[in-house]
């Protein structure tokens, strides 16, 4: 009897990608083959995103394509928390489960296409089959979020903060490092809140106890001898405790912090945990300790009630903060978000567009200035793609997918996963260019 074949679609953020990796691990362990195409597979699993309307549309379209090409579809992920929305457009899906519902997904798969042999779960590592390149991996340390930002529905989709025991996280990280992973990208909904829900409980890792706390976890990960990059860090005061580890080279001098805005009134309406002036003070303090710290962030323009004065305050804040990398989103109402019920005046779409363009132009100049400081330096670069003597990679200041790249020429062939020293010869607003030395 041939093994059942499952095609898989993974949409959304890195947290959802980790969920997909875990499901695929279970499928592989139970003897299922992962098909590259929907056509010819026994069924299709679609891991959806449901955060923004554009993401919901993408998910619904992906479900429709899978139904058209295969006809037997199981839906999971964040949009799965709204089964009525899915059934209304696609009534013929086989089953719908919400996010992180691994057992429910497997039960639906078993019913639709029974496994060809008994499962041997121990044959595969608990961290799962990786969907990223072999040289980097996402390390998810918690699920859910305790914050109640008015524009966000993640707590409704994924629940409150649930931190993993520190020893579990570290065992997974250690296995990844031993398997040849060169870079770990630490992710969650709120990385700096790690352990709060379990009162920083300790667990045994090897011969010692480790606390489930942001600082302690960072210290332990820093002992692995590979790149460790922190994502989704809220700007709490205790983030300052981790900066010395970056200055010492234990973890990468990089913080991904979603500041979202700078106007006190807009931040209050968003229910964000920081004030623009306070974050500027914190950024200055962090850079005093670690001068080469790179900061990436995301912002929202056109939030209900945002005035011209609020927006100008944001631009002024950008000039002061000198954020290295920044993404910007035009606010769009999300079904179920409390920002819909604040009674604030909606910002016209043309105003949102104009503000977005002004934001991006301002940030482009700042990014270009920051990158120009790298010209003439010799920097270690992790190769992501290689084509003989030309390659593309990243410095310790850039995360995959969301930041810039280093375009490299070399006299000798390079391979993905290599770390090479590159002399930076020029820069633009997004990327660096140089030669391997």
UniProtKB/Swiss-Prot annotation:
Keywords: 4Fe-4S, Cytoplasm, Iron, Iron-sulfur, Metal-binding, S-adenosyl-L-methionine, Transferase. [4Fe-4S] cluster 1 binds at residues 13, 49, 78. It is found in: Cytoplasm. Its cofactor is [4Fe-4S] cluster. Residues 372-437 form the TRAM domain. GO terms for biological process: tRNA modification. It catalyses: L-aspartate(89)-[ribosomal protein uS12]-hydrogen + (sulfur carrier)-SH + AH2 + 2 S-adenosyl-L-methionine = 3-methylsulfanyl-L-aspartate(89)-[ribosomal protein uS12]-hydrogen + (sulfur carrier)-H + 5'-deoxyadenosine + L-methionine + A + S-adenosyl-L-homocysteine + 2 H(+). It is an enzyme of class 2 (transferase). Its EC number is 2.8.4.4. Residues 131-369 form the Radical SAM core domain. The keyword 4Fe-4S applies. Residues 4-114 form the MTTase N-terminal domain. Catalyzes the methylthiolation of an aspartic acid residue of ribosomal protein uS12. Belongs to the methylthiotransferase family. RimO subfamily. This is Ribosomal protein uS12 methylthiotransferase RimO.
